[in-house]
Amino acid sequence: MPSLRTRREEAEMELSAPGPSPWTPAPQARVSDAPAVTHPGSAACGTPCCSDTELEAICPHYQQPDCDTRTEDKEFLHKEDIHEDLESQAEISENYAGDVFQVPKLGDLCDDVSERDWGVPEGRRLPQSLSQEGDFTPAAMGLLRGPLGEKDLDCNGFDSCFSLSPNLMACQEIPTEERPHPYDMGGQSFQHSVDLTGHEGVPTAESPLICNECGKTFRGNPDLIQRQIVHTGEASFMCDDCGKTFSQNSVLKNRHXSHMSEKAFRGHSDFSRHQSHHSSERPYTCTECGKAFSQNSSLKKHQKSHMSEKPYECNECGKAFRRSSNLIQHQRIHSGEKPYVCSECGKAFRRSSNLIKHHRTHTGEKPFECGECGKAFSQSAHLRKHQRVHTGEKPYECNDCGKPFSRVSNLIKHHRVHTGEKPYKCSDCGKAFSQSSSLIQHRRIHTGEKPHVCNVCGKAFSYSSVLRKHQIIHTGEKPYRCSVCGKAFSHSSALIQHQGVHTGDKPYACHECGKTFGRSSNLILHQRVHTGEKPYECTECGKTFSQSSTLIQHQRIHNGLKPHECNQCGKAFNRSSNLIHHQKVHTGEKPYTCVECGKGFSQSSHLIQHQIIHTGERPYKCSECGKAFSQRSVLIQHQRIHTGVKPYDCAACGKAFSQRSKLIKHQLIHTRE
């Protein structure tokens, strides 16, 4: 093999030989100008039909009629030979390091394909010895550039022209749809002849690579390796942004692209600031409290919280702020400006964050989920409040009584108990309330609105709490049980009131007479004795009553209804209390005993009346004559003397009496007759 120096001298001699100037432009005959013919691989590789000359130049498997066999010197260079050529070319000079032509293809082509077929001007063709050997000297490579510029050879994949330089090589590395080297087995095509040579060693359909796990066949070893990673579960490629791992590097690259497409940035500085959010590095530390930040701007904003200075002051009310952005938002309160408008319903907001939160009411989006119970919320603040249900945290404490609350709104409402503040006033009757919800419920008295409807019977209620109590009638549920006697109740309030029977606790006292009650409702009813209020009136006779239950019982006199019947004797009563009292006649039960004399009574009212005998008290006084009585019933009978009322008539003779006992005695006269 001739030495490198000898070849360089031969090239220089060729350049100095007399003849036409090598820089004279000559008409270039391109391969694409040759007549086109079809070949078996044209459909598979997707390239247009080629001429015989082009086919032989780019496809070593194609044979012309006069070239039946391929000789050894026409074969493609092995990769080892190419590597050796590259190493030898790199040793020539540092001045020509960037001009090394990686794959010398001209010398690898069939003898019938000359430089003329590649469009090289006759004056710029390489010496025959160099074109056959495939070695290029710097001087010879200079022939291929020259004053014509680096546009003498075409890249097969593009219309642009390049010289034999890194420009052509870089172009040939770009993936393209056109691969001018069709593979005659399977119709595959390749961009470079070296790729085709490497492909010839890939297993064919006759000798595939088979996965031992699933039996799937592959045509390449890399595909088989990736398939085996799927079976082993190995995930060696981790995403730096989200921490997710992947078994293939290509999938990881796609993942990186998805992160980059999620957020767009105006410049490199914005992108760098954004990347600091993913990094755990926080180099900016507050000297006051030690809190660290990833950005210097965030630190500066935070440091203003330690400063008492509030340089941004509102011209309307004088309120000061540490940040100008907070002042701008505040000023919208005075101006009424609401620049952020919902595209769905048209509702406007002063802050963009409020619009984002509001928009979730239309979309139903609830991105904040509780890790304990899975309940989802549309706002992070609502999630934090909810999580206190699980933790039991009650950070807000009343300064007056020490009672803690999980929400600051509940503390504010509670504090009005101590201050007596009632800021919510009814515009119809002037009644004031401490809570807005109480005012809303109260207004339903005036409007008659009953929005809460029972889905079983259709009955409507003004309050949801009353509906819940009503629904227990249908279910029969009594979840509240007394721990002392085992009695069950449908409502917790009823259980609390019942427990006062065992404890003797009567926290509700009358301010007029000092009488105490176990229930607040009983105190309210009792106070009507002092006020004389009787708001419930009978529509039949006009009689009024202090309690609604008493009116209902009275109306049974007019309609004759006696729904409460004794299962022993069949006697019916218009009141359940009268039935209970009557049943003690059959049982002989007298649970109420006088502590003074030991006498027993079936009714508590009878015991109370009896105890007055021992005390000598006469609380019932006649307003006409001033006479006092120990029992209310005796006073009523006495008052008939003054009024002349005789409600008890004899059915036999029609005589009337003021007392029932006198009527009974009179009726004995008729029975004797």
From Swiss-Prot:
Pfam families, A to Z: zf-C2H2
Q: Name one GO molecular function term.
A: RNA polymerase II cis-regulatory region sequence-specific DNA binding
An annotated GO cellular component? nucleoplasm
Region (Required for nuclear localization), start-end ranges: 332-364, 464-494
- Family in the record: Belongs to the krueppel C2H2-type zinc-finger protein family.
Q: State its role.
A: Acts as a transcriptional activator. Promotes cell proliferation by facilitating the cell cycle phase transition from the S to G2/M phase. Involved in both the hemin- and phorbol myristate acetate (PMA)-induced erythroid and megakaryocytic differentiation, respectively. Also plays a role as an inhibitor of cell apoptosis.
What this protein is called in its record is Zinc finger protein 16
Can you name the source organism?
Pan paniscus
